[in-house]
Structure formats: structure tokens, C-alpha cells
Amino acid sequence: MKFLFALAAGIAGALCCGENLLPNSSFELGTAGWGVMNEVPKENGKFQALRVRSSKDSVHGASSLELRNPDGGLVVLCSPAVPVAPGEMYTFSVWLKASVPMTAELSFFSPIDGRWHVVSRKVPVSKEWKRCEFVRKIPAGHPEVVVRVQFRSEGTLFADAAQLERGGSASAYSPSAPVEAAVEMPKTWCTAGERNVTFRAVNYGTSAAEIPFSVTARNALTGWKTEKRLAVELGGGKTVEQQIRLPLLNRGAVELGAKWDSGQAIPFRLAVLNALPRGKSDPEREFCVGVNETGVFRNAGTAHNPYQALGIDFAGHLEMLHATGVSVIRLFEYELGRSWVINPERGKFEFEQLNRFLDAVAKSEIVPYICMDTEAFSINPDSKNPRHVAVRNWFMARDGKREKPLNGMKNAIPVSPLMADWNAYIRAFVENARGRVRYYEIMNEPNLRMTAAKYSSYLETAYRTAKQADPQCRIVGICSTEDYGAEADAFTANAAKIGAFAFLDAFSFHPYQAALDSSAVPADRLLDKLNALRTKYRPEVQLWNSELFYIHSVEDAKKHRRTDPQFLRPENLTRRYVIDFGEGVRVSTPLHVWQLFEKHSARMFADPTRFGQKAVPNASAAAQNAFVYFLHGAKPLGRLELPAGVNGYLFRTADGRETAVVWAVENSRGFFLSLPAELKVFDLFGNPLENVSKLLLDERPVYLTGKNLKGFLTASAFQPQEVIAVTGARFRQTGELAVEFQNRTANAVPLVARLKDGGEIRKCTVPADGRASVRFHTENPAPELLWFDGSRQKKRRLNPVSVRKTMFSGEKVRVGEALEFSAEMTPEFLSVAFSVKDRRRGERIPGQPWTGDCLELFLDTAPESGLDRHLPGASVYRLFVVPVSANGLPAELSGSPNLDCGKIRWSLKENGADYSGKIEIPWEAIGCSGPRELGFDIIADDAEGTKRLAYHAWAGDDRNHASRFQFGRIFMESRRE
């Protein structure tokens, strides 16, 4: 039925108007630019993707899409993300017919600010072609949309002539351009080499034309590009297809495209990878990297989440992950199958659907490990979501105990299952999975939900029971997190102290506050601490980094932590892997799987199952692939001794050669590295860097191979790109600005500096590999700085940290009606007296004083140093003074790990819910030889019952733990009259 094709001549003018926003809307180019997702229930067991076909039964042109759905599962056809004007009306129309009468659903889908917004309309579909329409006003804040067609009926749906246009009604259909083209490959990844590329083009007009096309492949991150030209004879109303050979020799994230005088082809994105060894890795013998979840068995509102196929069978999906370097996958119960369905009644277990999933994973080259507990240890008491109700009812039928809410857990209450139920669940699960699963992690982030002692009891039961069920299994435990501001160090140390290490084969951690070597707590420093625990309590226990979704540099954290928290640059992933491997970690699975794949919307990180688009490995996946390519089977030889600002590790590969990985800690402070001819250098993705004698080293690691690398990589091989760098500026008080300079050489450097808007000339000497702060008088909130380091004059516009509150030694201060305090500096102590008014005493969680009524002190002994670091570091101390809680916990004084609380004198007097007291902190307890000017803040936390109601802060707010730049300042001298 081709009656619309006959209208082509009549709408020739409309073809050039661009009214239709959808590319390949007539589907003459197959599914190019579009995505198809189909769900396959676990009981199916085959986990195969829908084979989309082109049908000659069409409305427009020669083809339509044919979507066969023999099992009646969900099938979704998705457009690419299309820019739209918020506040305007848009009409989505598409011609549909079906092999049997059914109902389809048209929808507008927008991923905005971390949420999915979907508005749908159901339409009847018959055996005859019918145009279906959906009109929607685009809400404010939705600059792009995806339109979708979906159905859940057995049978075949045909789709053709889709159109998205501005306005409140559908106009006559017209393609988005007179000529359209696309380039595609069979997979979204390949190894480097010459590869076949499919080129398709369609001419919607009536006249034949010979069109010169330029087909390209480019890697935006490396600057590589290749091009092939071809002339194509396009008959009127015809589609042509050609196979061409392209040399895809540059590894990384590559985009295939084509252009001609009047247009551009629909691009095809893929990853070009290094070829990796086949077969499974052994986490007990070699370093392994991996991800959290397979990503394609997501929550679909059912107890047994189905396979959500993205144009690829599950076996192919796992093959793709392995090609990117994934050798282990951390699996959760919500991906495997809901615990209340696996264990619906005491003594009853149903593993049939789970086994189909485990069988499929076991056939792959990837080793699974399962995190046990997700829904057994927390419930949502108020949610009406059917899944939450099912969890709640399932748990309460087991007579377990509800606990008090813990910090970081939103809308959830931690619970304690009966140990007999926990024991039965572990035994049945491990016995069933024996031979297919060897590794089990006991609980995800238990420090958010229970004390170390309680956790250790569940860990011991799981360990003993699992070993009886499968003597070959391995137990991973602890799994403490620093996310949500949680304290991981104390939990891990307490668990180790009470004997938890006797009941695990590896202990895992989530280092959210120590993600990189540029973090406030450098990654290697945290690993030193964890390795010390391991050495003290059980040296043979392995270290596993099982989750770290936010691997941010300092600049990344400022830009993306709130708006796009899972933002990831490929160099940061490589750095994390190298640090983990070099410091003795055995397994590193920091990422969620979709962090290794291209985003299909510019607005947020969203997994491709929501868009139905193919999963395309991104630059981070290519960087991971290169890491595994160079260091598979290698042994770490240790951290290299390099100049400040440069980091790196040395490894011996399986064939006995040396490989070093080096990088600059921060992009703004690069180094030149002189390279001898006999040294081979490779970029982040494994591409050789040829004919480079002097390399500018930045945050992107490079791989070096050759002999005597440790001898070559000495301080003399590195020259700073910038001798003196300005790290930052901060107002000390109104009219007085501190600017910090960093010397990146091995020699002291004399410096002359002034502000451009006038004022004094300042002179100082910046010590070798050190920093110095200089103060200027200015009222300008963003002055321009000029400085001379002996070689040349430089300038920079400053963006200082603004003034916070200030006080003098001995001054009394009131914060609202709730808090009054004074702080005095004596030769021996910093003395703080305080009085807090409280209406009602609240409860608190053991080990988490900030969850109840308490007084917090924040001290920064170097407020004008490290001005490129807002996160609290070694100079920042946090102290808690806590009265008796409503749930019976005693008064106590505690503090951050770097604070020796045993040296601090304190007193506390309680009068009903009010409390007052005095704290005397010896200067040596905070690393000072005597009185000095401090960054300072004080907060009175107010809780009632189990809720933290408010905080009363002098200078900052409840984010002080994440930014020292919120602190005020306390001056040494008394207030001048």
C-alpha cells in the first residue's frame, strides 16, 4: 500500500523545509538512528534480541519496519534524542498496522535532572495501516525528547512514516531531507584493523542523481581521522547499499559518518579496541577489573526482572563486556531475582528462573560474584509501590527486628532478619549456585545499616554456612562505604578488631572520599591504611574495590557531582585501576556497567535500555581495554619515586618485560617528559605515540615499555610546564586577600607579585617543591594578579573564595537562640566554651554522632594553604561532643581519625535537654606547636526522636564535612576596640 509515495512530487517543497525532526523516519535505511529494545522473561532462558526486519509492505517508500513479537513481551521502538522548544506544542505521528488487532502506546520521553519523564497515549492498531497521533506541550526544562512506540502483544507490528513536528496537529508526512544516508557495522565494537562498513543512502525525490559522498571515521579524543570518497548513483525513490573498507587503526571511541554537499549521514558510534586474551580470569591469581551489574536485567516492575535486549543477545552482550576488559561482574539480588520470590516461605526456595540467568553467565568468559542482602536488610515502611509492599510483607512475616534509621538511608529502615532465616537463605542459595558461582559478597555497605558487631555476626553465619554448602566458595566481606558522608574507617577497624577477618577471604571497600591521587584523601593513602589492617589481622586476605561510581578529579567534582554524579573521564578510570593494582588490590569493579557506554541523551547519564538504543562502548571502555591489554597477568613492582605532581607505577608483564604507567596529578600542572628513542610510548587507549622526543604529561596516563624504566623515570626526566603556579585565592577578611603559589621545581624560586588594580608589590621565596601564600589588600572580588618568577611575567584573573565569618580569640558569639560559644587561644590550648539550648533530646546511631544531638567543631590549621582543595584534607580536624542520647547512649567525645582525642580535656553538664561544657584542645593534638590562626566553625545539631531536625552553624552549614572553604576564621589576637 504505497499511496503516500505517490504524493512525493506534490510535497517536494516540503521535503526541504525540515518540518519532520526525525531522521530515517521512513525506515528506508533500516533502523539507522533508531533503537529497538525487547524484553525476554527469565523463564525463556535463551535471552535473544528481537530480529528487526524490513518489510516491503509500506506506506511510504519501499520499506517499513517489521517487529515480530512471538512471546508477547514488551517491545519498544525509540527515536534518537531530538532538540525541541520547551513550552511549544509538538505532534508525534506514525503509521501502524499489525498482524492481529492490538494496542500500542505512543510516548514522549525526556531524561531531565536525573529523572525520567514519560507521557504516553494508548492507540488501537488493526490489520490495516492507520496513522496514529499524539500531541504534547513540551514542559519547561525539557530541551530534548525521545519519541517511542511500544506494545506488549503477541504478533507483528509494522511501523512506517514517523513524524515529529512543531504544532498541534499532524501535517502531510514528509521525510526530514530529500536524501538521507547512514553508515553502520555489525557490532558496536571491533578490534583495530581494516573493517567492512555498510553505507546506505536513499533518494526520496523522483529524479536520479550522482552524489559524491565522503565517508569518515574519527576519534575526537585523539584527533585521528580517516576518509574515503565515493560517488553514488541514486535513482529517484531508490535506496542503495555498498560495502566499503575503512582502516580503523586508532583505538578509542570512534564515530563513523558521511557527508555530501547538502547533508550529513546518520552517524554510527563504536569502540575500536585492542585484542585481549580469551578465557576466564582467576581473581585469586591475577588482578581483575569489572563492573557492577550486567545492566540488561533492570527493574521492570516484576519480581524476576526480564532481559532487556538492545539489538544483541545476552551472550553477545557479555562478549562485548569481556572485549572491553571486564573479567568479573558484581551482581545484585535485584538483577538476579527478588529475594521474596526466591524464598517465598520458610523452607521453600524457587531457583528455576535464577538458574537460567546463572547458566547464561556461566557460559561466558566473565566471572560473577554476588552481593547477598539487598532487600533482606532494609524496608520502606511507607511506600505504596507494589514492590516495596512485597518486600515489607515478606520481611515482616519472618518476625525480624526493625532498627533505627541510619545516616544515608533515605525512606528506608534497616532491619535484622532472624539468624535462622539468614542461615537458611545462604545455605540454599550457595548450594544451588555451586559450580557456577564461587564468590559472594556479604551485604552492600553495612556501615550504613548496622554496627560492626552486628554485621560481624551475620558475616560469621554466612561464612560458616556457605563453606559447608560449597567448600570451594570464597566470601568477600566488610564492604564499608564512604558515600553519603559515612564513616568507613572506624567500621572497618572495629570489624577487624572483633575478629571479622577470620570469616572472609577478601574484604571490600567503597572509597568515595579517596577516589584518586588528587582527592583530599589520596587514594594510595587510604590503601596504605587498609593494607596495614590486612597485615595486622590476616595478611592473606585480599582487597577488593567493589564500588566507586564517582571517580572525580577536583574539577570534575565541582562541575558534575550534583548534576551528573556518574560523569567519568577515561583517564580517571585508568588512574584508579593503576593505583588499585599497584597498591595490592586484587579485584577492582568500581563502575556501574552503563558508565562504560555512550550516553544517548545529552541531558543526563541514562542507561540505554530506556532509549532502546544499542549499547556502544565509550572512551572509558576503550581505556579499560588498553589497561587490560598492557597489564593482563602482570605483577606490580611498586610506586615510582617521582617529583611532586607526577604519579606512576611500575609493573612486570607476564612475558617478563617492564611497563610503567605515569601521569600528571592535575591537568593545570603538566610536566614535560623527555623520551629516549629506545623507549616505546602508548596513549590512554593503546595507540603508539611515534616520533615523540618530548611529551607533555597531563592527567591522561601513558604506558611506557622498555628496559630500566625505574632508572630512567627519575626527577630529572620531568620538567614542569609552569615553574610557578597559582593554586587559588581566598579572602582572609574583608579587604585582605591571600594568594597561594606553588613551586614545581627542585629549587627555591624568588617571586615578585602585585595586583593589577594597584597596591603593594609583594616579594617572597617559594620553597622547592613547596607552596607559599602572600596577602594583598583589595576590595575587588575578582582582581587580576601579575607575577614574575625570574623568567617571565604572567597574569591571571583570580576567582577567590569569598569572605566567611571572623572572630577574635576570647570573643563570645551567639548563634540564634540555640547556641552560645567562645573560643580562646592560650599558649597550651584552644579552649572552647559552649552552651546549647534544646527542647527535647533525640536518639542517635552508635558511631555516628551527627545523627543525634551534638556539638561539632571544625578546625583547619592551614586555611591559606591548599587553596586548590575545598575538600577537607590532613589539615582539617572534626570533633564531636555528644550528650546522653534519648536511646541511652552515653555522653562521649570523638573525632576524625587524624585527631588524638585522648589528649583533649572536656567537660559536659546537662540540664534537662540543654547542655553546656568546655573543650581544651592541646595544640599538639592538631599538629601545631603553639597558637595559630585557624579556619573554624561550630555547629549544634538538633535531633528529636529518630529525626535530625536542624543544625545551628556559625559560619557554614551541614555540608562542612565536604568543604573546608565554608569555615570561618578565628584570629590569634583579642578583638581590638
Region locations from a protein language model:
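Catalytic-core region of carbohydrate-active enzymes that cleave or remodel glycosidic bonds
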Residues: 514-595
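Extracellular beta-strand elements of beta-rich domains used
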Residues: 27, 94, 134, 160-164, ...
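Structural preference for beta-rich elements and adjacent junctions enriched in aromatics
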Residues: 60-61, 171, 777-977
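Substrate-binding cleft and catalytic face of glycoside hydrolase catalytic domains
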Residues: 324-504, 510-514
